[in-house]
């Protein structure tokens, strides 16, 4: 089954907040995920830089760390959400603002924009996690309950699904969303990135 780009968010098997992201692509498979101190980025592989002139949607920050929060998305709205949170906007409104403003991608497939934000704390009263999607018919932002993990994809059910996210470290999380568990059922995996909070946010990646 091909579901396009996938993100997962919530708490992992150890009760640690995490985000994970996978590129699945039929048209532009020559991409990689690069990790930095406070972000992970999707970029063309060396020799395929010209691809950005064919499709401006293929390179972006897929993960950003701002304050105590991790932001994950399938496009440039990662930065919009991060900027709004840095300015003091709450998580729900930051996701809704970015999805409403940028809307679905204006490509041949009307690719939906998906996004999520999770706080670093594992204290129930302080924990916050939201996931959202904007397609050509709707915009949804949903709160994810404490202790749960979910995933959502661009061409899947258009609503989040629960998942047992059995990965402990950031690198393990990137590998898990690439081809572990239920994600092994989804085709055309290209690259993946993730962040897991273990006293601090750690960013990982997987490039096959």
Curated annotation (Swiss-Prot):
Keywords: Hydrolase, Purine biosynthesis. SUPFAM superfamilies: Archaeal IMP cyclohydrolase PurO. Its EC number is 3.5.4.10. Pfam families: IMP_cyclohyd. GO terms for molecular function: IMP cyclohydrolase activity. InterPro entries: IMP_cyclohydrolase, IMP_cyclohydrolase-like, IMP_cyclohydrolase-like_sf. It catalyses: IMP + H2O = 5-formamido-1-(5-phospho-D-ribosyl)imidazole-4-carboxamide. GO terms for biological process: 'de novo' IMP biosynthetic process. Pathway: Purine metabolism; IMP biosynthesis via de novo pathway; IMP from 5-formamido-1-(5-phospho-D-ribosyl)imidazole-4-carboxamide: step 1/1. The keyword Phosphoprotein does not apply. Belongs to the archaeal IMP cyclohydrolase family. NCBIfam families: PRK04151.1, purO_arch. Catalyzes the cyclization of 5-formylamidoimidazole-4-carboxamide ribonucleotide to IMP. This is IMP cyclohydrolase. It comes from Methanobrevibacter smithii (strain ATCC 35061 / DSM 861 / OCM 144 / PS). The gene is purO.
